[in-house]
Amino acid sequence: MFLCLLICSLPSFALDRSRVEGYLLPNGLQVILKSGYERDHVAIRLVVGVGLDDFGCEQKELPHLLEHLLFTGIDETGEGGLEERLQSLGGEWNAYTSSADTTFVIEAPARNQRKVLDLLLAIVRDTRIDAKALATAKHIIEREDGGHYGHLQRWLDRQDIGHPASDQLATELGLKCPERSNVADMTLEQVKTLREHWYAANNMTLIVVGGLDRLLPAYLERTFGELPATEPEERRTLESISQQAEQRRDLTRGLLGDSVKLHWLFIEPVLDSDHQQTLDLLSRYLDWAVYDQLRLRNGLSYGPSVQRESFGDSGMLSLNADLEREDVDQAVKVMQQLFDHLRKEGLDPDTFARIKDAAVAKESWSTQGNSALADYYWGALSDYNNGRFADPARMLRQVTLEEANAALKELLKDQGYLRIEKPFLGYDELYGLVALLLGLILALGLLRWRRHKPERPSGATRKR
């Protein structure tokens, strides 16, 4: 037994997540297969190369609408019958439409993987889309977005009311649509055209991770290999920064409270090499820096953080902090001092080395299980080539302190954009208004009483 444990602990038995069985079916559909540790389970991801950014502002929700339509049913039993069939196979599914793609996510027992894949193929190929299904899908999307998109909501969107700080800045810079597209105006013809031109085999990637059926490759060629291919659509050019934005703005979030959220946003620079890994390490470093300054040293924020997002063709890095209303000015001063120090001194070598080592170490445990591994492949498709995914740990190791400092210099060359989200009124302001209102009521009452005070009787009317 000791010998067996020793053999199984050798590195050769470790799962190499970078190496996969990848190939193209004759129709151009890309297949990525990986045998995982959990042999009784499979994680399936069907990635279709069409997302929200492939359409202009008026039709941006069109891929999302089609995603919902594909779950409305493949026969007269409708959506319920489709769900019952998947339940009978012991599976669960969902779908997500992002800016870059539409992905169908399925978890299922390994013993039923081919039957579940049959069902996935059926919803892509055989779903009947009609006016009734379209109306139902539109209603679902409206509910997801908070209800009917009327004139009031459209006006609020145009005033940047209710938007997160990063969305507000992206809109101000021209990287994001000022209002959401009107799903009610989308037609059956538009949906069918999208399905015909974008849901093509040569625009899809099928990822299966887990206890793989030994006949799976032959099955996929016989089934998914029959999906039609089309001439790929040309993807639209992403929005670029086209407008100026104010350096500082206060955004109203809610009516009453003393909690404030501070966001200091910077446009990410475009780097020559190892772009994502360098910026990833830089964001981790800044995350530690704001934690150290705002929480540990000054006690201003409980959970400061750093977040990276993309809008159009630009990346955005945001340093965030939860604050009390009276601490905003002090927090702004502390962060300004931090930026000035980084501009002058650069990154601390020892801190950078520690954060880099931690990031590399995290890669060894961050994708545990079939589902996490399938999601990793889904997110790293741009780093896939000829049966291998790029090794993120190796790429992180290659980032030098000099490269990170150069990226930091480019990031902080401008002042950035400060956005402060706070309620319309703080409690102290409310108490002041209440006191003012009570004082006004009291003054008006006193004035009214004095005007109507009864006159004293004169002495001439007294009896003798």
Residue ranges, per PLM feature:
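N-terminal signal peptide c-region/cleavage motif recognized by signal peptidases
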Residues: 9-11
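Histidine-acidic residue clusters that define the catalytic metal-binding segment
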Residues: 16-21, 159-204, 380-408
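M16/MPP (pitrilysin/insulinase) zinc-metallopeptidase core fold and M16-derived inactive scaffolds
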Residues: 45-106, 173, 288-300, 460-463
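Acidic/histidine-enriched segments that form metal/cofactor-coordinating
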Residues: 75, 82-194, 242, 351-374
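C-terminal regions of mature proteins
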Residues: 205-210, 344-346, 350-464
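Buried hydrophobic packing residues in well-ordered domains
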Residues: 28, 46, 64, 86, ...
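A structural supersecondary motif
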Residues: 263-265, 283-323
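An aromatic/glycine/proline-enriched structural segment found at the starts
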Residues: 200, 205-260, 266-270, 442-447, ...
